[in-house]
Amino acid sequence: MKITSQEEYGLRLLIRIAGCKDKQGMSIPQLSEAEGLSSHYVAKLARVLRMGGFINSTPGYKGGYVLAMPADKIVINKVLKTLGGSLFDKDFCETHSGKLNLCTNSVECSSRSLWQMIQFIVDQFLDQVTLHDLSNSEKKPVNIFDELLDQSTKTFSAKNIVSDRL
């Protein structure tokens, strides 16, 4: 599993915009310089974030990008799925069946169960992390993760996760 550059840089741009004190927001050149990315790539990422409803743009000489809603309302799981999708897409088995039209393991597939459990746990965590959490302190997501781990020992069951996803 890998985090794509679009997910990483898109999230970094969003954190940078959230931390901007200027009411005009940040322009593409400002974001480009701050993150060390090309203006073209920043524009592409900004378009994806704008289409996802996370940022608004103000055109013109003094224009820029601002958050479309308060940072505490922007859920990181939604941001990452907008930028790149799920780690394990439910259609994965249909598109990665090798030379056959149908995966030979489609009825009994232990690797699919593993990916579904990992996706479930990642979703549970990322659904609790907001842009506000990331733009204020690195400790906040760690605290959320610790709380989730405490809950997981009480409530998560691999049988429930897999059967709910099939």
Where are these regions (language model features)?
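Key DNA-contact positions within bacterial/archaeal DNA-binding proteins
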Residues: 40
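Conserved segment of winged-helix/HTH DNA-binding domains
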Residues: 71-96, 111, 117-121
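C-terminal regulatory/oligomerization modules of transcriptional regulators
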Residues: 94-166
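Short amphipathic alpha-helical interface segments
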Residues: 10-22
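A short alpha-helical element within helix-turn-helix/winged-helix DNA-binding domains
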Residues: 26-36
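Alpha-helical residues within the helix-turn-helix
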Residues: 33, 50-51
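Beta-hairpin "wing" of winged helix-turn-helix
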Residues: 52-62, 66-68
